[in-house]
């Protein structure tokens, strides 16, 4: 039974916080919706942080044509939600997540089969790949839903998952059970490998390069049990000390926060000493079109090597020592660190399987470019997330980011940008 609009608005906000608390998403990633009638649902808006989202911020969307009410734009994945309600009359709550294990398992493009006594059904299909917000992705998910009428979830290759339920609780149960099932399958491949790296790290502890925050010419650095404040103007440009590395990064980027990431999967990839190409959309968007690895050729030049690896990116690896993430806010750098960990786990999983391909360079560069151009500036900003009501012509004419745009508009932008990239035009850089 559909919710009243007031019930749906309150429930979606509560569910958004629950989603973050359960570790099934972060920031504005993913989206949630609730059916309010046979013709409409309410959905989270585009680019607004869950921490400041309120019931009145949700958007009412019409299932038949995706038109919407109010002065906020709905999630770019509104079409996927509409299809879920259209194809599944019994569904009243939909959650799209970027949950870790389901995302990693989905990079192969395989269905999750062999499930028994599961709320998910006997099989969870994996929808074919499509760029976020595009008609291609929407159609792929709709095809998966149509072909698997008993499944309560759909994996989205290189992206995340869609979980359905007759109510909020059953949709959450589907998300949690999906994560548990995918963790088991991923663990069958990764657990032994990661255990070996953890044992090596215990025997030969790697340096802790710490985390820091910059204010003006000064930065506060904490590594191990040490916390100190440094003046950028007085830190030597060479040497392998944590302070020298952080200072070099601050001098060459616009970062305000830095974190040294030492998770098992990140360390494992750093030992290979190679550039990591993203297998997941969110890593390409947030970290960069690839994650370079700074090499340990000369301790004195290490700060420069790390800072150069981070140019135009928000994450880089350091050979044998994990990785570094940077951001303009504490939230940005924490998000980059969590995505680097998940992305490295996906890359290691792909390496061990041997039959997975990363995102194409065009898709990875395009997602990074459009994320920097728009979506990253909107997160957490209520004023920026608002939009004046548009006519159909205005909506068609507006160019938006892949993550935010209406599906048809993004499809056009995607093709144009991809063609430009194929012709060799440089992608924009940031840091």
Segments (PLM) and residue ranges:
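Glycine-rich flexible loops
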Residues: 1-391, 403-406, 410-431
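Low-complexity, intrinsically disordered Ser/Thr/Pro- and acidic-rich segments
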Residues: 395-399
């Amino acid at each position: 039974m559909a919710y009243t609009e007031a019930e749906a608005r309150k429930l979606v906000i509560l569910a958004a916080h629950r989603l973050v608390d359960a570790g099934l998403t972060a920031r504005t990633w993913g989206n949630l919706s609730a059916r309010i009638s046979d013709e409409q649902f309410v959905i989270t808006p585009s680019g607004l942080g869950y921490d400041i989202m309120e019931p009145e911020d949700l958007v009412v969307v019409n299932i038949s044509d995706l038109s919407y009410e109010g002065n906020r734009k709905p999630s770019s994945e509104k079409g996927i939600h509409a299809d879920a309600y259209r194809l599944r009359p019994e569904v009243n709550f939909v959650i799209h997540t970027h949950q870790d294990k389901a995302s990693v398992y989905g990079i192969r493009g395989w269905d999750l089969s062999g499930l028994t006594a599961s709320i998910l059904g006997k099989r969870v299909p994996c929808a074919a790949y499509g760029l976020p917000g595009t008609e291609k992705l929407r159609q792929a998910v709709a095809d998966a839903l149509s072909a698997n009428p008993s499944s309560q979830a759909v994996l989205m290759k290189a992206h995340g998952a869609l979980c359905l339920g007759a109510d909020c609780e059953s949709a959450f149960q589907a998300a949690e059970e999906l994560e548990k099932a995918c963790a088991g399958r991923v663990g069958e491949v990764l657990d032994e490998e990661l255990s070996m790296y953890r044992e090596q790290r215990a025997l030969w502890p790697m340096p802790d390069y710490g985390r820091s925050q910059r204010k003006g010419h000064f930065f506060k650095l904490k590594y191990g049990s040490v916390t100190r404040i440094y003046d950028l103007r007085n830190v030597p440009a060479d040497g392998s000390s944590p302070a020298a590395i952080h200072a070099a990064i601050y001098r060459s980027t616009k970062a305000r926060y830095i974190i040294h990431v030492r998770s098992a999967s990140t360390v494992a990839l750093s030992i290979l000493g190679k550039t990591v190409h993203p297998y997941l959309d969110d890593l390409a968007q947030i970290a960069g079109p690839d994650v370079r690895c700074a090499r340990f050729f000369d301790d004195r030049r290490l700060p420069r090597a790390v800072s150069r690896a981070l140019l135009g990116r928000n994450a880089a690896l350091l050979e044998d020592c994990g990785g570094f993430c940077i951001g303009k806010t504490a939230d940005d750098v924490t998000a980059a660190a969590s995505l680097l960990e998940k992305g490295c786990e996906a890359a290691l999983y792909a390496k061990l399987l041997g039959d997975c391909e990363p995102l194409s360079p065009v898709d990875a560069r395009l997602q990074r470019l459009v994320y920097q151009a728009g979506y990253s500036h909107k997160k957490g900003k209520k004023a920026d997330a608002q939009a004046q009501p548009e006519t159909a012509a205005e909506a068609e004419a507006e160019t938006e980011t892949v993550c935010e745009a209406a599906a048809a508009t993004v499809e056009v932008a995607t093709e144009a940008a991809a063609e430009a990239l194929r012709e060799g035009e440089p992608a924009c850089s940031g840091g």
